[in-house]
Design a protein with these regions (language model features):
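Start-transfer (signal-anchor) and selected internal transmembrane alpha helices
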Residues: 1-96, 291-300, 518-519, 525, ...
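Membrane-proximal stem/loop segments at transmembrane-domain junctions that anchor or position
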Residues: 126-128, 313-418
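Transmembrane-helix motifs of polytopic, lipid-linked glycan transferases
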Residues: 169-192, 230, 451-458
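Short hydrophobic/aromatic helix or loop-helix immediately within or flanking a transmembrane segment
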Residues: 133-163
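Short acidic/glycine- and proline-prone juxtamembrane loop motifs at membrane-interface regions
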Residues: 210-224, 262
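Transmembrane-helix signature of polytopic, membrane-embedded enzymes
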Residues: 185-207, 466-470
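Extracytosolic helix-loop segments that constitute the early lumenal/periplasmic catalytic or substrate-binding loops
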Residues: 111-137, 143, 342-348
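Membrane-interface anchor segments at the N-terminal boundary of transmembrane helices
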Residues: 21, 36-49, 167-169, 173-174, ...
């Protein structure tokens, strides 16, 4: 039973990744929302990547056939570890400097949460009337508001940033989580592959996340990037004894539940862990294996309940009254995800429709009814076409739709210096003269990550790595299905980019070592045949009459 479940999980991952690759390589001409044009088509990028890797494999094989062996890396593990730590620290400083130079204010959700946080800190201003409505409608932003408020209070006490630049206090937190997530990718990979491969995966996530313009917007998409990879690391890392292992895994569940209140998609990693534990129970059928999934779910429920209660009381203490009847539930986002006219993205028409119902029960029933009606109107083929467009919106863009949605550059700050600020703005602003260079580099790395992440589905599973690998692949399956079902955004993928980079590194390492192993076996067989022939020749020369 366990083998069947693991195999089905692997097949589902390979199927979804194959569909994604086919769409972004061969159907990028389809119309879909937030479509961004790149200097090179994805199929050209993929061809170049495979060509370079193929040439490298060929050179390696020829080198080994000529009697040489690929020696071990001259760089020690300690050097790789120190280099990764230093780069992560430097990345934090660079991100803060870049953010300070290209700072701007936007008017969509990050701007709204920031404005409410300002009113909370400056209580003499009085909270605006729309605060209760916004927080009640989108309660998932409650913890984010608390973090923004805490950063503002700390900045007010220290006095580092003033005026409009006070928002830098929250952006610094954003930069910390991004650089921390990048370093965790390296730490996770060192548990599975050699340091040289781990360092390569680390550099990939630095390009895609560490140097992404999303670092300048302190919102749940970038702030939540730390939680899935940290949850995975804490849950799977080796421990000295059973007690430490349990403590680490309990802490992983707590971290994931906190991440849920930053970005609900963080919970997908915990769901993948629980499902994998159930797979293990089906394999061993032991009592403690059966108890683990239920204990994890129970612990998660307690953590979610406690965190929700604490956060809610924080707001009630300042006079904010949360109205559960105005909350937008999952059925609202399911309805938006089925809106073919808006490509499954945000729809003001759907928001107005949900607002028109006074109670949560009425709203849920109406959302479900409209969702069913939209499915009937699209039909099977229409729904498949709709899902294809949603997957293109999700996966096609290596910048994750930077500058493509909402009111982005509502207010741009004046240049803080004469040269560096204009130069950085020309790179990171979507309308900058040098932005094409950045987005092309990120697109090349992203296409490569998707290609090798697909190859991770062919990694040979052993007793040691089967469960760990299954958690990674199941989390990607869950995230992809989430995007297909509910409201779609390319930036929703951003917080799982570290997981994609981990899978891509595992896939590349599997391909590379496979070629080495195959070439090495053939070379040894050839040497053995040559040695046997030489022995027979010497025997005949020594005993000619025989």
């Amino acid at each position: 039973m366990s083998k069947i479940l693991y195999r089905l999980s692997k097949i589902l991952f390979l199927f979804l990744m194959a569909v994604v690759l086919i769409l972004i390589l061969f159907f990028q001409g389809m119309p879909y929302v937030c479509k961004k044009e790149f200097f090179l088509p994805n199929i050209v990028i993929a061809t170049y990547i495979l060509l370079v890797v193929g040439i490298a494999f060929l050179v390696c094989r020829l080198w080994m056939r000529s009697g040489h062996m690929l020696g071990k890396s001259a760089i020690s593990d300690r050097v790789f570890d120190r280099a990764a730590a230093c780069i992560a620290l430097c990345l934090l400083a660079v991100d803060i400097y870049i953010s300070y130079n290209i700072l701007f204010i936007n008017r969509w959700d990050p701007g709204a949460t920031w404005e409410i946080a300002l009113f909370r800190v400056n209580r003499d201003w009085g909270l605006p009337e729309w605060t209760n409505i916004y927080i009640s409608r989108y309660p998932n932003n409650l913890l984010l508001l608390l973090l923004d408020t805490a950063c503002l209070k700390l900045n007010g006490a220290v006095g580092v940033f003033t005026g409009d630049y006070a928002v830098m206090s929250t952006i610094i937190l954003d930069c910390i989580t991004i650089s921390g997530a990048c370093f965790l990718v390296y730490k996770v990979l060192t548990l599975h592959v050699k340091r040289k491969y781990a360092f390569g995966g680390f550099l990939a996530v630095v390009v895609l996340c560490g140097l992404s313009p999303w670092m300048t917007i302190c919102y749940s998409d970038s702030l939540g990037i730390l939680f899935p990879v940290l949850t995975y690391y804490l849950y799977t890392k080796p421990a000295g004894n059973t007690r430490r292992k349990w403590a680490s895994q309990i802490f992983a569940v707590i971290i994931c539940c906190i991440g849920y209140f930053i970005k609900p998609q963080c919970a997908i990693m915990l769901i993948a862990i629980v499902m994998t534990e159930f797979f293990n129970f089906c394999k061993e059928r032991k009592l403690y294996q059966m108890a683990r999934p239920f204990l994890l779910v129970a612990l998660a429920c307690v953590c979610l309940s406690v965190t929700s209660s604490v956060v809610t009381k924080q707001y009630e203490s300042i006079g904010v009254e949360l109205n559960p009847e105005t909350k937008f539930g999952m059925t609202h986002f399911l309805m938006m995800g089925l809106n073919e006219a808006d490509g499954g993205m945000y729809s003001q028409e759907d928001v107005d429709y949900s607002i028109s119902f006074e109670t949560s029960k009425e709203r849920t029933a109406a959302n479900i009814e409209k969702s069913i009606q939209r499915l009937r109107d699209m039909g099977f083929l229409g729904y498949m076409r709709h899902l294809s467009r949603k997957l293109l919106t999700t996966y096609h863009d290596g910048t994750f739709a930077w500058g493509m949605e909402g009111s982005f550059y509502t207010r741009v700050m004046d240049d803080v210096n004469t040269w560096m600020a204009p130069f950085l703005k020309s790179i990171f602003y979507s309308d900058g003269s040098r932005h094409e260079i950045l987005k092309t580099i990120e697109q090349i790395v992203w296409v490569g990550v998707l290609l090798f992440a697909f190859a991770a589905g062919f990694v040979r599973q052993t007793e040691e790595n089967q469960a760990d690998l299954n958690i990674l692949t199941l989390s990607i399956v869950g995230l992809t299905l989430f995007q297909m079902l509910f409201e779609v955004r390319a930036r929703y993928l951003f917080l799982y980019v570290p997981v994609y980079c981990i899978l891509a590194t595992l896939g590349f390492e599997n391909l590379w070592t496979g070629i080495q192993r195959k070439s090495g076996v053939k070379r040894k067989e050839k040497e053995k045949k040559h040695e046997n022939a030489k022995t027979e020749s010497n025997f005949v020369d020594r005993y000619p009459l025989l």
